[in-house]
Amino acid sequence: MELELCKETYSCYEALPPLVETREQSTETIVPDYCPDIARIVEGSGCLFVRSREIADGRVSVSGSLRVTLLYIADGSGGLKSFSYTLPVEETLDGRLREGCTEASVSGCVSALEVRALNPRKIMTRAAVELTVTPYCAAQLTACGDVTQRAENGIETL
């Protein structure tokens, strides 16, 4: 009795090693008029939002925004106040994708955030944003799916 395995081929994507890019961004922001002056900054917190990614000619372009929330003690009243502001994030990883990669997943995080007061109405924000791009290339997966002449040889599939 000679049996042969039937192989089936499936289209899939193969994940390649991730590409990590860290970018530092700094900007000055004016405290909105509706907020009281800053006496002392208590804490700043940031969250990265990746909005889009484009893949073309071996490069990945990522765009998004960094949402920063600042908690501070107001001048005069001494009470805690907060306000949020948004910083744009644009990054291009040029020439680092293997040829044939047509898809990629992008994730990111804020690895460091520093907010300090330059004066009671102006703050300096310095943020390090880490982007991780995992490229995917089209691939084929071959797996055994059945046995030839199963019925003739009395083979049962469970």
Language-model regions, residue ranges each:
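Viral structural modules
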Residues: M1-L158
